[in-house]
Amino acid sequence: MKNQKLLIFNVHFMPNSFGGATIVAENMARYLQRDHNWDIVVVTTIKDPKIVPYGIVRYQSAGISIIAINAPQSLSYVEFYKHDKMSTIIRNLIQNIEPDVAHVHSIQTMGAGILDELSCAGVPVAVTVHDCWWICERQFMINKDNRYCFQAKIDRNVCQHCVDDFVRADLRLDYLRDALLKADMLLFPSEFHKQLFVQNDFPVHKCHVNKNGILPPRVGYKKTEVKDSSHKVRFGFTGGPGPIKGLDIIVKAFSGIDSADYELVLVDAAQNIQVSWHMGLNVDVKGTLTVRPAYTQETMDGFFSQIDVLLFPSQWKESFGLTVREALIRDVWVISTDVGGPAEDCVDTENSALIPLTSDAAFLTSAIEACMDKDWKSYKNPYKKALQTVASQAEELSDYLTRLANKVEH
């Protein structure tokens, strides 16, 4: 039986990997092709000043055929979501590739015209809605004050106070809504994120949860022992600078703790895109502060084996929280805000401590203090078998895509 052909779209792709959505897109492409007999072609973008704008580069990575369109160095406001020149190129690619089904991930700069082209070509489409780009100009529902806006049912009268030009933002929202409604299936990384879009009148029969999968630890993975007894508990944070991921609250929380018997490990994740944020870092804690280089999917075992507790005091309702699951499956305790996707696999007091979404650091301080006297050497997460792995996500996704390709009711 001939393999079915799957066309995948994502703004970034290996070797130019960036962001959680890209990790998911790459993992799914690899596993769908390797384990589920899909013939896969990926369409992505690059930004290479040595190549003419809109030039096409074809290459292979991890055995996957990739077509990269060279995006211009600068784009207009409209081109970030409605990119007509990209759409023309993609129309020709669709005609040449003749896919059985398409899977759309994050397509900022590529433009939602992709969905028009696929619809016109009669190609069934699944869209994984990784974030709020489709319903929020600022993509993550974080307002001008750098705080979560807390809307559930989007009221554009509220949005007008958050954008620079409401008329153009309104046109953008109309266009993206109409485009997303052309998809045959909408996939979401969490029940929370699915319900957000259902509340905003996207058809419930099209909406399904396909939780992001994580790579389990390698065989033989185990925690490293603390060599210096003065660093009794090791706390890790991967979110970077700024208030929205919670670093400010972490600093405040530790300032209220008298003990210096801990290590705070910060990951300079920006190094994965050849920049760094730690040079201007101003973190003053009584314990030992360590800044470590960014880790990759291949090296994350090393990072998680050297921390006991992951700090995830995010100040917005994230759609999933990949880092939380990567920690949970490696027997790392998690302190997380009790909102959105990150909390869905956390069981308070059993594999995590859930705290309110608030700028008051007292809740985080209490959760940190509760970790100080625990013996983390023997801790095991009793719920880690329930976590979605990359393999199980790919199996579930393959079933969804097969149903679409074969035009089976879903």
Task: Enumerate the predicted regions with their spans.
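Short alpha-helical segment that forms part of, or immediately flanks, the ligand-binding pocket
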Residues: 301, 324-329, 343-344
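Conserved donor-binding/catalytic core segment of Leloir-type glycosyltransferases
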Residues: 7, 227-245, 251-254
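Glycosyltransferase donor-sugar binding loop
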Residues: 238, 263-278
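Nucleotide-activated donor-binding/catalytic signature segment of Leloir-type glycosyltransferases, i.e.
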Residues: 276-298, 302
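N-terminal subdomain of nucleotide-sugar transferases
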Residues: 1-55, 60-65, 121, 255
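Short hydrophobic beta-strand element within catalytic cores of glycosyltransferases
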Residues: 309, 333-336
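A short, active-site helix/loop in glycosyltransferases that binds the activated sugar's phosphate group
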Residues: 163-206
